[in-house]
């Protein structure tokens, strides 16, 4: 039986928490859910051979595979069961190869190989039917009756954080950026999970290691994006269509977007970004393409309506895909780790089918009324005007900063974030990132002495920029980040948000408001431990005005 509770929208009922019947809330069927558990288990098995790295046993392709494989198991990434069967087979082969290399290196160096157990020895079956029979023994909640939900939840916190790390690392790796520090630490954490830990305090400390690793990975991706596409710059981006054939690119992968822009040059096709791809319009080497026409639509949960209305093909480069509607299923394409049964997948970097579809479809028949928003306030931009921001604070023009953003979702409780942003006083600045920004990024915020009151920092992955800016302000005021007139309100949905949140906790940042609901895997015991240590507030529903007043009172 399937069991999944990794996303914010997991089933919650009097009978219990977690999606236990198909389809899950995300649309995942039982086969896909349990195959993802098996693949994750095998990734731990590969990591269990980490002792070989010190003996010179390292395989970049296997390193890539670990991150790629974990990426496919995130919420709203891949729903194709047959694809997971192939990934499981590949994982098993890679694990055995690394095992042989490790044992050979140990013999050559006169060392005794470690005795392997658990995921390192698990043998996946050959057929889908047999794999489904094996799945219960490796499920996230395996043996919960004996271990208890606290232990399972603490393990889940680490695992889901690592899935988020894998996603961000994979985006950097496709741009050719890797770090000799990242993979050994990732293996260490996965190997720790493979040991089936049970000490709650120890596991919460290990979750902070996930956060520290994610800080390195986010910085690596920032360098990769900046080196590849230039530093984000303040940009007025069009958010209404113009006449012409069109392609819509959603997801997060800037490398994929660059390939599409390159292959559509001089083809008479306009390329639009969607969702978390919005910040692409602020990178100099991407916006230099004249046919990058702007951004259309909003956050991932609105895609079924927005994609149905779009008169051209759609390309999903990463999460978040949800079940394609009939009206556009034959004109949506997936790339890389993304997949949906019956949807065409491009795995060779050749976008000819997308281009052909764009030419065959009507496109936009007329220009819409021009609408624009301003983006591009990454840390390179903001640190360049840090002295101006500091002066505004010292002179009382800026009283408070709010960081409001993260993942969006369907829950009406997420209106909290709109209320906070819209009701923040005129002498405050709202920084935002992730697709949560779409709840208010088309609203008018004005400016303070030429400093825009709404600063769009970028994707969820660009939380690194927010951290850099907060650190620079703390240094300028000779205080800690927790002493700044800064309030952090984060919306979460999936595992990347978990990794980012763990990074903030690892930095010792307190008073974070997380919502709209409590992660299902955080039991009351775990919540109590987190709240006592990190001054966390996990109950946001209906408290926007009160939270604003409390934040401003603290500043005063």
Swiss-Prot record:
Lineage here is: Bacteria, Pseudomonadati, Pseudomonadota, Acidithiobacillia, Acidithiobacillales
Q: What are its cofactors?
A: [4Fe-4S] cluster; hybrid [4Fe-2O-2S] cluster
Cite the binding residues for [4Fe-4S] cluster.
4, 7, 19, 26
Family statement drawn from the similarity comment of this UniProt entry: Belongs to the HCP family.
S-S pairs: none
Organism superkingdom:
Bacteria
Give the note describing cofactor binding and stoichiometry.
Binds 1 [4Fe-4S] cluster.
Q: Which residues form the signal peptide?
A: none
Chain positions with Cysteine persulfide modification: 407
Keywords on record: 4Fe-4S, Cytoplasm, Iron, Iron-sulfur, Metal-binding, Oxidoreductase, Plasmid
* Protein name as it appears in the record: Hydroxylamine reductase
Record GO terms (molecular function): 4 iron, 4 sulfur cluster binding; hydroxylamine reductase activity; metal ion binding; peroxidase activity
Annotated hybrid [4Fe-2O-2S] cluster binding lies at: 252, 276, 320, 407, 435, 460, 494, 496
Which BP terms from GO are recorded? response to hydrogen peroxide
Query: What is the originating organism of this protein?
Result: Acidithiobacillus ferridurans
UniProt subcellular location: Cytoplasm
Q: Which residues form a coiled coil?
A: none
């Amino acid at each position: 039986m399937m069991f999944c509770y990794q996303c914010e929208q997991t089933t919650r009922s009097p009978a219990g928490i977690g999606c236990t019947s198909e389809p899950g809330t995300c649309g995942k069927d039982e086969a896909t859910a349990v195959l993802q558990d098996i693949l994750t288990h095998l990734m731990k098995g590969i990591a269990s051979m980490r002792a070989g790295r010190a003996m010179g046993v390292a395989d970049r392709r296997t390193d890539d595979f670990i991150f790629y494989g974990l990426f496919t198991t995130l919420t709203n990434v891949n729903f194709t069961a047959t694809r997971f069967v192939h990934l499981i087979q590949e994982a098993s082969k890679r694990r055995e190869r690394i095992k042989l290399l490790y044992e050979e290196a140990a013999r050559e160096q006169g060392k005794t190989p470690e005795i392997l157990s658990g995921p390192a020895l698990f043998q996946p079956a050959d057929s889908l039917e047999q794999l489904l029979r094996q799945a219960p023994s490796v499920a996230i909640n395996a043996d919960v009756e004996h271990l208890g939900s606290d232990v399972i939840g603490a393990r889940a916190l680490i695992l889901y954080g690592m899935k988020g790390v894998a996603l961000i690392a994979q985006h950097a790796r496709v741009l050719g950026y890797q770090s000799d520090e990242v993979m050994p630490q990732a293996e260490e954490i996965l190997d720790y999970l493979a040991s089936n830990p049970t000490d709650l305090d120890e596991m919460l400390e290990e979750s902070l290691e996930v956060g520290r690793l994610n800080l390195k990975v986010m910085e690596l991706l920032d360098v990769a994006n900046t080196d590849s596409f230039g530093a984000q710059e303040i940009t007025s981006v069009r958010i209404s269509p113009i006449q012409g054939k069109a392609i819509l690119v959603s997801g997060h992968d800037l490398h994929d977007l660059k390939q599409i822009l390159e292959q559509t040059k001089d083809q008479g096709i306009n390329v639009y970004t969607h969702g978390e791809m919005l910040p692409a319009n602020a990178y100099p080497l991407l916006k230099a393409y004249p046919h990058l026409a702007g951004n259309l639509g909003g956050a991932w949960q609105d895609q079924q309506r927005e994609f149905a209305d779009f008169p051209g093909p759609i390309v999903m480069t990463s999460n978040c895909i949800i079940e394609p509607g009939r009206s556009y299923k034959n004109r949506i394409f997936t790339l890389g780790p993304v997949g949906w049964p019956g949807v065409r997948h491009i795995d060779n970097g050749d976008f000819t089918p997308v281009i052909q579809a764009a030419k065959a479809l009507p496109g936009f028949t007329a220009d819409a009324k021009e609408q624009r928003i301003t983006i591009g306030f990454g840390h390179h931009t903001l640190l360049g005007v840090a002295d101006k921001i500091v002066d505004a604070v010292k002179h009382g023009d800026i009283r408070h900063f709010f960081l409001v953003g993260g993942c969006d979702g369907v829950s009406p409780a997420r209106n909290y974030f709109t209320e906070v942003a819209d009701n923040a006083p005129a002498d405050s600045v709202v920084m935002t990132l992730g697709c949560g920004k779409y709840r208010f990024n088309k609203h008018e915020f004005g400016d303070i002495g030429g400093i825009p009151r709404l600063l769009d920092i970028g994707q969820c992955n660009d939380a690194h920029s927010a951290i850099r800016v907060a650190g620079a302000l703390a240094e300028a005021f000779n205080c800690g980040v927790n002493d700044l007139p800064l309030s952090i309100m984060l919306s979460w949905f999936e595992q990347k948000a978990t990794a980012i949140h763990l990074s903030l906790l690892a930095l010792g940042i307190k008073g974070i408001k997380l919502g709209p609901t409590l992660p299902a895997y955080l039991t009351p015991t775990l919540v109590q431990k987190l709240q006592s240590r990190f001054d966390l507030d996990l109950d946001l529903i209906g408290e926007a005005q009160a939270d604003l007043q409390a934040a401003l009172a603290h500043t005063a």
